[in-house]
Every structure is written in C-alpha cells, then in structure tokens.
Amino acid sequence: MADNPKAPTFIKEGSGDLESQRRNEQVNREVGELVTRKSLSDQLRENSKKKRQQFQRQTKEKNSFTRVSNDDLDHINKVKLDELEKLRNFSQWAESEERNRRKQLQLLQQPSTPEHTNKQVISKNDPIPTSIKVRKLKTSNGAKNALGVISKPKHKKTDRTQKK
C-alpha cells in the first residue's frame, strides 16, 4: 500500500474479506502499470536522448578548460611552418652539395688531356680568381737558416725628400 501513489483505500466496516481486497488492489496496480508502461521504442528514444545530453555536458566541460586560444594556435602554426622551411632549406642544400660532389667526381674521372685542362667549370657561387703578387723574403747574409723577414720596399729618394 505504501508503494501506491494513490490515496489509500480503507476497508469499510462490515466487509472483512481481505483476499478480495488484495485482488482488487493487484488489478488496480496492473492496470496502472499498463497505463504508465512505455513501449520499447519510447524507452530507447528516451535512453538515447539522455545519453546524448550527457555526452554534450561532458564535451562542454572538457572544452571549457582544454580549448586553445587563437594566439596559441597562430604560434603553433608559425612554429610548424618554420620547421618545414628549415627542412626544405636543408634538403636543397643537401641536393646542391650532392650535385657539386658529382661534378667533382666527373672532373676527376675525365682523362687529363690539354683540351680538358683548358676548360674550367665556373658556377655562380665560385669566387672570381685574381692575381696576387707575393714578395720575396729578404734574408740576411749572417742568418741563412733564420726565418725570412718581409720588409717594405724602399722608395728611391726624390728631390723633394732630399731637401727636407
């Protein structure tokens, strides 16, 4: 009787048939359960709705403290682009070094004839050769084994320097 949400029914005076009263209450409970019982599709629909709402609550909670700001995203993207650029530069450098090495190997493998020695391979990165004058070392007569000393060339005295 405590389970029944309806108001309790009391036994009238004079009727002491408890078994018939129990049967009546049982029938009333079954009829009430039939009315309140939902179909399987309704139960599944409500269950999926509850699960979806629970999942949405969990994602809101997670996103509230794990979301990255736009500045942080920009910084992360910039770092990734810098790494890709460094990788590209390194691969280009490695390819150019490989080409230079192959050219040098080809030059070494070619027969050394006068025709081939006159030809020089000049690339944009090679320095332009210039002529350099090297002065002879001046050695003193007394110290032949000593290291040579480079001295400035002496200028011939002109009329102007003699007058002073």
From Swiss-Prot:
UniProt keywords, alphabetically: Chromosome, Nucleus, Telomere
Compositional bias ranges of the Basic and acidic residues kind: 19-47, 58-72
Lineage of source species: Eukaryota, Fungi, Dikarya, Ascomycota, Saccharomycotina
Pfam families: FAM192A_Fyv6_N
Keyword flag ATP-binding: no
GO CC term, one of those recorded: nucleus
Family the UniProt entry places it in: Belongs to the FYV6 family.
Organism from which the protein derives: Kluyveromyces lactis (strain ATCC 8585 / CBS 2359 / DSM 70799 / NBRC 1267 / NRRL Y-1140 / WM37)
Protein name per its UniProtKB record: Protein FYV6
Residue spans of biased composition, Polar residues class: 111-123
Chain residue ranges for the region called Disordered: 1-72, 95-164
Role description: Involved in telomere length regulation and promotes fully efficient non-homologous end-joining (NHEJ) by a mechanism activated in postdiauxic/stationary phase.
Annotated localization: Nucleus; Chromosome, Telomere
